Amino acid sequence: MTSTTSKVTFGKSIGFRKELNRRVNAYLEAENISPRDNPPMYLKTAIILAWVVSAWTFVVFGPDVLWMKLLGCIVLGFGVSAVGFNISHDGNHGGYSKYQWVNYLSGLTHDAIGVSSYLWKFRHNVLHHTYTNILGHDVEIHGDELVRMSPSMEYRWYHRYQHWFIWFVYPFIPYYWSIADVQTMLFKRQYHDHEIPSPTWVDIATLLAFKAFGVAVFLIIPIAVGYSPLEAVIGASIVYMTHGLVACVVFMLAHVIEPAEFLDPDNLHIDDEWAIAQVKTTVDFAPNNPIINWYVGGLNYQTVHHLFPHICHIHYPKIAPILAEVCEEFGVNYAVHQTFFGALAANYSWLKKMSINPETKAIEQLTV
């Protein structure tokens, strides 16, 4: 997939990316490590899929005890996010396997959890990874103007409260994804000024088939085995609201956070070479937390991921020190929050900063 031609260009290489690639390749060769097709990733995939299937089975067919059902739905919601973070993400980036059919099947798990892999690969792989934190190009920081993530975004009165209400918006995002996917693929066919490559009938059929799959798994089957329609809707809502909260928080901690930079969308040329711009617009978090490392599929090493999306995420903890060395040598700040809650606080701080009307702030500065 390719994007429409963009006027945004990046600076000439100063050797940063070349040197980083050289050292990472040297590490992989010295340790005889394959960047993809790794047995630990296969095992992880099996564990996550077993988690999701067993949680769903427990919720639908398990003991008829309310608190167990509710807990099971939450556990299933965390499992759905784990599928997206690990299996779907690596597959759709081509980082799961050297075999494209394996990546394709892994990527289809995105469709299975409610997100079109076809649209995701364009929106995320092309637009987000190329134009990270550039408003008007990076769809993932746009937020449909409900939340002001970038200083370049027009301020609206309700942004004043965004650092409070955003936590109540996250759980509903999966519903938005499901509806927006259909609207975008069938009718809209573009993100901002970027035209989406025309989907084939197979792409459209895949989209609709998996939307139907979601309805069957979370509504039709539960109702068929004896749950009321209301009970089925409540259960599905708990699952997907849990998934939405978890997925959105993890994304925000990578880019919508201090000290990540937001590049000026009116500047058609970025002075930095692309790889350096990626480092400046991205932040890692909780690198020494083994639970987070395993669960979020390396997305806490988001900077490493943006530079090496084609490498399986299980290698990111070893690549991160190499990146840190190269950044230090080239005078590039490699931002890392050491804890999850430290990153969460930095994200909240940024959202609060963006909640201030820039015109009011400018007037206050003039009167000082």
UniProtKB/Swiss-Prot annotation:
Annotated pathway: Lipid metabolism; polyunsaturated fatty acid biosynthesis
EC category: oxidoreductase
Site (Important for the regioselectivity of the enzyme): 313
Cell compartment(s), UniProt: Cell inner membrane; Cellular thylakoid membrane
Catalytic activity entry: a 1-[(9Z,12Z)-octadecdienoyl]-2-acyl-glycerolipid + 2 reduced [2Fe-2S]-[ferredoxin] + O2 + 2 H(+) = a 1-[(6Z,9Z,12Z)-octadectrienoyl]-2-acyl-glycerolipid + 2 oxidized [2Fe-2S]-[ferredoxin] + 2 H2O
Control of this protein's activity: Activity requires ferredoxin, which is the natural electron donor, or cytochrome b5. In addition, activity is increased in the presence of the intermediate electron donors, NADPH and FADH(2).
Keyword Cell membrane: yes
Keyword Lipid metabolism in record: yes
Effect of residue 305 to R: Retains 17% of delta-6 desaturase activity. According to PubMed:16328883, loss of delta-6 desaturase activity when expressed in S.cerevisiae
Domain of life: Bacteria
Membrane topology listed for this record: Multi-pass membrane protein
Motif position, Histidine box-3: 305-309
Motif (Histidine box-2): 124-129
Induction: Expression increases approximately threefold after lowering the growth temperature from 35 to 22 degrees Celsius.
GO CC annotation: plasma membrane-derived thylakoid membrane
Ranges spanned by the short sequence motif Histidine box-1, renumbered to the chain: 89-93
GO biological-process terms attached to the record: unsaturated fatty acid biosynthetic process
Residues annotated as transmembrane: 47-67, 68-88, 164-184, 204-224, 233-253
Cofactor: Fe(2+)
Outcome when changing residue 129 to G: Loss of delta-6 desaturase activity
Extra facts: Cyanobacterial desaturases use ferredoxin as an electron donor. The enzyme cannot function in the in vivo system of E.coli, although it can function when ferredoxin is provided in vitro. This is probably due to the low level of ferredoxin present in E.coli cells. However, the enzyme is functional when expressed in S.cerevisiae, suggesting that baker's yeast has a cofactor that can complement ferredoxin, probably cytochrome b5, which is absent in E.coli and cyanobacteria. The enzyme is in fact functional when it is fused with or coexpressed with fungal cytochrome b5 in E.coli cells.
The family this protein is said to belong to: Belongs to the fatty acid desaturase type 2 family.
Notes on the domains: The histidine box domains are involved in binding the catalytic metal ions.
Stated role: Desaturase involved in fatty acid biosynthesis. Introduces a double bond at carbon 6 of linoleoyl group (18:2) attached to the sn-1 position of the glycerol moiety of membrane glycerolipids, leading to the formation of gamma-linolenic acid (GLA).
Protein's recorded name: sn-1 linoleoyl-lipid 6-desaturase
The organism of origin for this protein: Arthrospira platensis
Gene name in the database record: desD
